[in-house]
Amino acid sequence: MIKSTYYQDLTKMNTFRMKVKAKCFIEYDSVADLVDIEFDELSRPILHIGGGSNLLFTEDFKGTVLHSKINFIEILDECQSIPEAPSQASLGPSPNPGVGKCLLHTNVTSSDSAEVLVSVGAGVIFDDFCDWAAKEGLWGVENLSYIPGEVGASAVQNIGAYGVEVKEVIKTVYCYDIVEEEFVSFSNEECEYGYRDSIFKSPEIKGRYIVTHVVFALSREPRPVLDYGHLKDAVMSACGECQSASEAPFQDLLPQETPAAEKTTKRITPEMIRKVIIKIRKEKLPEPSVMGSAGSFFKNPVISYEHFHKIEQAAKAEHGADFKVPHYELSDGAVKVPAAWMIEQCGWKGRRSGGAAVYEKQPLVIVNYTGEAYPEEIIGLERRIIASVKDKFGVELHPEVDHI
């Protein structure tokens, strides 16, 4: 079914809760619906949104906003040849994305194999997918738990958290090309993933491809990623005394009535790590339903080692010889420094500017503090933060949030 609305209020469709409208809003339930949309007749520009969690609407949108409700999760347990044209009225199991060529899922595994391919509709809430995977005992997306947004947008943005990026588990992204009016697929390599970036965000093709579904390569074998920041400490604390994180019994996360003997035999699972991640995120980040935000507003800057050394020496002079600047060394010799640390060092944590503010628990987040903030107030605060970080550290921050 296709639902079209003119001058649609988008307040509840963006997590910043900007009070804006779209000239035209179209919501569709299936691939068949997507094919039926007359894109040549739509008001331009065209914007496809997911959960609206990485957007800052700066004004009313003068074109057409589209939203997918393609909602399914399916384990691909046998090689599936995709028909040439979609025939289902709604996309449930066994989606039909192929038009003009046969799309073939290769290397699909059986139930006793380590790798498990999972096909997920673009309209599925990403955290619902994480929850499903954890409950199925499948590894790969547990560190990405509680990130707002939908599956289609996750593949475009290359979302990441706690040492994991979604590109690490994406095998294939299936899309509808609104220019050629055909379905196409992009392998992981063809997506050209970078830090919060992909080919779908490049100016040359941005908006041309609409994600219909994504195939993820998850694992039945334990593959915990715990080497980011203090995550391992949080996991170890949650599991009590244990010999290794990969075999850790999460005693504190088990029901209180669980017998002690049974607790000692419990081993780490994706669901257990998911619970730890959610606990951390709830402590650090605002609930969008309570206080509007887009999550992390800025990208973490990547600088040369020489530049980092200068920053560290200045920090030691300011805070003492034992002070350590948080950082992550990359394989090419460059260094990634947390933007949150830089912003806090510039004194922005908890500061307000009109209806906007830097979140008091996480300076990487700009919030709609009053619920009535204007886009200009968000942008003004953003520019002042960028200027102060540039002045103090010689580093220019770049927003992760798309300005529309």
Name what the model sees in each region.
Residues 1-92, 96-173, 177-179, 190:
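Anion-binding (especially nucleotide phosphate/pyrophosphate-binding) glycine-rich loop
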Residues 385:
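Phosphate/pyrophosphate-binding loops and the adjoining catalytic core of nucleotide-dependent enzymes
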Residues 121, 135, 345, 391-392:
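Residues at alpha-helix termini
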